[in-house]
From Swiss-Prot:
Active site per the UniProt annotation: 445, 488
Function statement: ATP-dependent serine protease that mediates the selective degradation of mutant and abnormal proteins as well as certain short-lived regulatory proteins. Required for cellular homeostasis and for survival from DNA damage and developmental changes induced by stress. Degrades polypeptides processively to yield small peptide fragments that are 5 to 10 amino acids long. Binds to DNA in a double-stranded, site-specific manner.
Residues binding ATP, per UniProt: 97-104
Top EC category: hydrolase
Gene source species: Bacillus subtilis (strain 168)
Name of the molecule in the record: Lon protease 2
């Protein structure tokens, strides 16, 4: 065989091998495609079957407010939301309030309301983007950030076309998706500090700037839109609505200073009845007034009321009944191991050493605070014992905090000084001040209440049980302003008080809108005594003691 024949044979041999190789590749590709198509058809069929199945609409969805009229008890909060977002220059907002009172529903509705106003910058296509801060996790390397956005560098892109070409791929975050609309962040107080700081920059610039080690302005392979994103940033002109169940002092000052703060309050008993009755009507069930009374004694917000109605209605359905009975409500209470809601009421009659103070808890909720004072003659040197208060408190931020003696305990020392200036000798007595209820009390606003209780206990003069009071007391007997005066007044009214004493400097025009209770503004502790002391059985008139104001 000649060399030419050998060369042709070798070429033919390798040609056959190469042909078999490519034929096998094509066969595998066809097999894979057929397999993928079969799998895709099976999955599509499964999806169609799943989409054909739907359960009934949950009761919580049925009773979700469709308009502002459906949100019960939050007229002031809704008014503030409209003022902040429905004008020509909408602002960022933080909404404080307990869970289940309508914060999210109000946020959804306020954007639709704003679209109706001609001056509003929100257009018809403005979007409402929701994000839960408790699940908004991010990667510190910048690979993923659902809030701000991220860049997928080629090393993380896998087999995509841009990854193989070495092109970084920007991914939009919620701040960009909300461009031209509203970004709602639920539980904004749980947002990671790094994300919070990034968002502050976005709120100022109204843009998101991304960077990548793989980006170069000189790279002509990078598409124009990616060049534009890296050079000019992603648009992020939106208005933020953050909702939280935390107190304002637990939110970073940097974000608070950029937002209008709106407060939603706890629902009152009658308002919870309205929510529960509406829920029962939606599922065509009847519930008696006694049943509503019992239900609202164990619920603290609208969501809990709806859930109880739904479970009780399930009991009625299984027994083919149209009515939700008291027995159904009692069964729900027992099976859910619910505890009754504490509802403090004023005393039945005036008593010595018993005074009605006022406290505020949560973002915008008040409560009546019964204070008990017992005084006995001391065997030797007198003592003072205080129970039911926080002994000390910690203030500051995550990076730095300081501990100090409880403000309530410090207020007691102010009270003793005032009583000494009035000619009394607290050191001659063993004084016990008790704040019942099991919840540690802190703050100086119970100052005048404690002073009144000690004065009453020493002189054996009863205190009017229909009067509640709040105010800090200074060393010279002046009544100083306090916070949370509106929820405190409303709490006094709900507890059955006929009068409420507040510091003179807390007078506001809006207080005139609160009906059903007399509001008395005082400047000195002597004025407090004039309003609260009741004549003892001997018809002895309460005496006046001048306060030494020259010690100021």
């Amino acid at each position: 065989m000649s060399w030419t024949g050998i060369a042709l044979f070798i070429q033919l041999f390798f040609g056959i091998i190469i042909g078999l190789y490519f034929w096998n590749l094509l066969k595998n590709q066809r097999t894979q495609k057929v397999t993928i198509d079969k799998e895709s058809k099976k999955e599509m069929e499964q999806l169609r079957k799943m989409r054909a199945i739907s359960l009934s609409e949950p009761l919580s969805e049925k009773v979700r407010p469709k308009s502002f009229k459906d949100i019960v008890g939050q007229e002031d909060g809704i008014k503030a939301l409209k003022a902040a977002l429905c004008g020509p220059n909408p602002q960022h907002v933080i909404v404080y309030g307990p869970p289940g009172v309508g914060k999210t529903a109000a946020a959804r509705l306020v954007l639709e309301e704003a679209k109706k106003h001609k001056q509003s910058p929100f257009k018809e296509q403005a979007v409402f983007v929701e994000l839960d801060a408790t699940t908004a996790r991010f990667d510190e390397r910048g690979i993923a950030d659902p809030l701000i956005g991220s860049v997928h560098d080629p090393i993380y892109q896998g087999a995509g076309a841009m990854g193989q070409a070495g092109i970084p791929q920007p991914k939009q975050g919620a701040v960009t998706h909300a461009h031209g609309g509203v970004l709602f962040i639920d539980e904004i107080g749980e947002l990671h500090p790094i994300q919070m700081n990034k968002m502050l920059k976005v709120l100022e610039d109204r843009k998101v700037f991304l960077d990548s080690a793989y980006y170069s302005e000189e790279n002509t392979q990078i598409p124009n839109h990616i060049h534009d994103i890296f050079q000019n940033g992603l648009p992020a002109d939106f208005r933020l609505i953050g909702a939280t169940t935390r107190m304002p002092n637990e939110i970073p000052p940097a974000i608070r200073s950029r937002c209008l703060e709106v407060f939603f309050r706890e629902l009152e008993k009658d308002e919870l009845k309205t929510v529960a009755k509406t829920a029962a009507d939606k599922i065509e069930k009847n519930i008696s007034e006694e049943g509503l009374d019992l239900l609202t004694s164990y619920t603290r917000n609208g969501r809990e009321a709806v859930n109880m109605i739904q479970i009780a209605a399930g009991m009625a359905v299984t027994e083919n009944r149209k009515d939700i009975t008291i027995e159904d409500i009692e069964w729900v209470i027992h099976s859910s191991q619910l505890t009754p809601k504490h509802e403090q009421k004023i005393g039945v009659e005036p008593q010595v050493g018993i005074v009605n103070g006022l406290a505020v808890y949560g973002p915008n909720s008040g409560s009546l605070l019964e204070i008990e004072v017992s005084v006995t003659a001391a065997q030797d040197k007198g003592s003072i014992n205080i129970t039911g208060i926080a002994e000390e408190e910690s203030i500051g931020s995550q990076s730095k905090s300081i501990r100090r003696k409880s403000m309530a305990k410090g207020s007691v020392e102010n009270v003793l000084t005032v009583l000494r200036t009035m000619g009394m000798k607290p050191s001659d007595y063993d004084i016990h001040i008790n704040f019942p209820g099991g919840i540690p009390i802190d703050g100086p606003s119970a100052g005048i209440a404690m002073a009144a209780g000690i004065f009453s206990a020493i002189h054996k003069i009863p205190i009017d049980n229909t009067v509640a009071m709040t105010g800090e007391i200074s060393l010279n007997g002046l009544v100083k302003p306090i916070g949370g005066v509106i929820p405190k007044i409303k709490a006094a009214k709900q507890s059955g008080a006929k009068k409420v004493i507040i510091p003179y400097e807390n007078q506001q025009a809006i207080l005139k809108q609160i009906d059903g209770i007399e509001i008395i503004a005082v400047k000195t502790f002597q004025e407090v005594l004039d309003e609260i002391l009741v004549n003892p059985p001997t018809e002895q008139k309460p005496f006046h003691i001048e306060i030494n104001k020259e010690s100021v």
